[in-house]
Amino acid sequence: IISDAKDKGFTEPDPREDLSGMDVARKLVILAREMNLKINTDDIDLQSLVDQELNDLSVDEYLEKLKDYDSEMQAKFQKAKKKNKVLRYIARLNSTGTATIKLEEVDSNHQFAQLNGSENIIIFKTERYSDYPLVHRGPGAGPSVTASGIFADLLMVSLQLDRLKGLSVE
C-alpha cells in the first residue's frame, strides 16, 4: 500500500516522514504557531506508526521491512472493526499547546471515519463552535494539491509585494 501511495505522489518522497509522524508534526507546529503557541516538534507526544530504528535503513530497505508490520496492523484493524470502529492517524492540538499524534480507534459514524483515499479533515472546536465544530475536509496529497498550494502561495506573495510597491524579490 505504501509503495503504491508513494508512486501516486500521496506520500512524501521519503515515506518515513509520513509513517514516523514527522510530516504531520511539522504541520501541527505550523498550526500551533498560527495560534500564537510556542511549540516545536519535540513538544508533541508523537506515536510513530513503525519502530524508529527502521529510519536508519535506505528507503528501499524501509519499504521492504514494512511488510513485517502487516500482521500487527491487520490485528489492530480487526480489533477496531469488531467494535464498529476504524483506525485513523490523528493529530490533536488544544489552546494550551498540548499536542498529540497517534493512531486511534474512532466510531464508524465519526467524520474522521468517512475519509477516503488521501483526504484530510480538520475540525475546529472553539467556545462558539463546541456543539457544532467547524469542519474543513478535502484532498490532502498528490501532485495537483501540491501544485495548487504552491500557486496559492505565489499569489499571496504577489499580492503582498504589490502592496509594498517598488520592492521586489529576486
Predicted features by range, described:
Residues 1-114:
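Substrate-binding/catalytic subdomain of NAD(P)-dependent oxidoreductase enzymes
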Residues 4, 9-10, 92-170:
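Catalytic, metal-anchored helix/loop core of enzyme active sites in primary metabolism
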